[in-house]
Structure formats: structure tokens, C-alpha cells
């Protein structure tokens, strides 16, 4: 399988499956001298850990304790590859015995079979959402690099199950259920998820990511535009079905004069561009949103086929999230950080040559 490495200069390669021995990754290209500890990575992993997130979360309990294997000495990176590993401890593969030969609707079962001629039916293997653990750990390394440059990334939920939130306090979202950007919406989202769970169904939502302190000049036109790379990063997450930057699809309904961000001596008067112009960061806050589909594992009867082409009725068992939100929020934050870290180092190379 190819496609397990992300980045050009700051590169993350990941490994592992949902029901394998463990997951992990290697970050190559991280400069020396960056403050980094296991605790810093663990803090990010704890935000996406299974068994939390209230009624939306899976019943699978994983401690997700990370071990740094290389690349760090006395609390700082050495410039060599940063390797990390997390053990799987709560696999329950017996839950999947009845779907050994059955394709689950909405999952990658049928496409993995078409591509490889075989698949790991236990929780989806590499296509499972558990794969994102390695992204979050790698993203923590990227965030450590960005922090040294005054760049921070935040992510929060702006809509769940069709119910929007008012982004009144995005900074406080990290301490609220569902990573909600306002307090009042939490009870409403909680009731919605419980209702959907009671019906044996699932819901999706929309997550917003913001990056602050991004300097002007990041991005490599034409095919490595910052917005193109960011969209690629977010779309690479399995549950994401759409990405918009800044005003996004709403810009299609505006006039040019309304969509343009006027410039003044004090800076930009708006941010419809989402902090990116011509594929290059403008110095404003970088803003992106990702549409997250409902989890395809629903506790209802569904029509499908098995690997011999026979029609069957399937009711998915096992332990599953009711929504990818809130656990996908740290994943999208991580992918944004990885993109910015890579672009930052690409820009440093260019300016070094120019100097």
C-alpha cells in the first residue's frame, strides 16, 4: 500500500490498523531544537481517544499511551526522525466475524477488495477511523514546530446533525463537549445525539479550523497552493466529504465587490479569502471548514451483498461512534498543522536560497 506519507519537507509516514498490534508513525524533516515531550503528544491524543465524547462516542476503551522511540533528547528534537508508537489494547475482533464476507454499505470493504483482492474485515483495518491516531500524534510534533514560530491552530464544531452553533467563543471550545464554540448549544447537541442513537442511526456535521499567526508568503503556486494543499490534507481524512476555504461556497452567491476583502492602512477589512490569496498566505487568520459525513456503521437493517454477489440483510454490530464529531476535530487540527509546518519549511528553503 502506498499513500501513507504526507508532506514534502516535513513528512509524516504512518502505520497500523484498527485491530492490529498498534499504530504509530515517523516524522522526518523536523528541525533540531524544537521543544517536544511525550506529554505534549499525549495531550493531543487524549482529545481524540475512544471512549470519551459523551453519547456520540464508541464504547471501545483505549488508553492510547504514546511512546517516543527516537528523535528527541532531553526534551528537544535532535533533527533525526521522530518515531512514536501506540499499542492497541481493547480490540474485540469477534464482533466482526459475521461480516467476514459481507460488504458494509458506506464502508471501504468493497473498494479494498477491488484494489487488493483481500481485506482486513476487523473494523476496517487501515480504512478505520482509528488510523487517524497517528495523524494526531504527528500533528502534535507539527504544532510544537509552529509554536516556536508564533503560529497556533484551533478547531471546533460549527454544526452537528444540521443544528448550527454561533462561534462566540472558539478559544473555549477545547474545554467543552463536542468542541462547541458556545456553551448554550451543548445541551441541544447532546439531546440530538441521544435521540439519533436511540433510533440506531448516526449524524454528521461541520468542523471549522483556524490558524493564527501565519505569516504572509506561505504557499507554492501553482499546484502547491496553500489552499490546495490544505484541502488535500483535510479531504484525506476518511469521514470528510467536502472542504471550503474562507467564504467557501457562499462566495459563489456573492458579487465580486462583496467578496473582495477591502484593504486599508490598518489591514484587511474582511476575510472572505480565508487568509489565502493566489494560493499564498496573506498574513490573516487561515480559515477552513470540513463537511463530515455520518458514520456508516448504523444499528439498522441495511441491504447489501456479500463477496460472492448474493444479496443479504445486514445489521452492523460492534462498538461504533454515533458521530465522528467530536473525535475528528483534533484530527483536522492536526492535518492543518502538518500542512502549515510543511509549507513553512518549504518557504524557509526558498528564502535561504534567495539570501
Swiss-Prot record:
Q: Which HAMAP family match?
A: Chorismate_synth
Which pathway is this protein assigned to?
Answer: Metabolic intermediate biosynthesis; chorismate biosynthesis; chorismate from D-erythrose 4-phosphate and phosphoenolpyruvate: step 7/7
What is the E.C. number? 4.2.3.5
Tell me, what does this protein do in biology? This reaction introduces a second double bond into the aromatic ring system.
Q: SUPFAM superfamilies given for it?
A: Chorismate synthase, AroC
Q: What is the recorded name of this protein?
A: Chorismate synthase
Source domain of life is Bacteria
State which residue ranges cross the membrane.
Answer: none
UniProt cross-references to InterPro entries, sorted A to Z? Chorismate_synth, Chorismate_synth_AroC_sf, Chorismate_synthase_CS
In this chain, FMN is annotated as bound at: 126-128, 278, 293-297, 319
Which gene is this protein's source? Answer: aroC
S-adenosyl-L-methionine as UniProt keyword: no
Ordered alphabetically, the record's keywords are:
Amino-acid biosynthesis, Aromatic amino acid biosynthesis, FAD, Flavoprotein, FMN, Lyase, NADP
Which is one Gene Ontology cellular component term of this protein? Answer: cytosol
> How is the cofactor bound here?
Reduced FMN (FMNH(2)).
Q: Which reaction does it catalyse?
A: 5-O-(1-carboxyvinyl)-3-phosphoshikimate = chorismate + phosphate
Any GO molecular function: FMN binding
Q: Which family does it belong to?
A: Belongs to the chorismate synthase family.
Q: What class of enzyme is it?
A: lyase
Residues that hold NADP(+) according to the record: 48
Subunit composition? Homotetramer.
Choose any GO biological process term that the UniProt entry carries and state it.
amino acid biosynthetic process
| Cofactors named for this entry | FMNH2
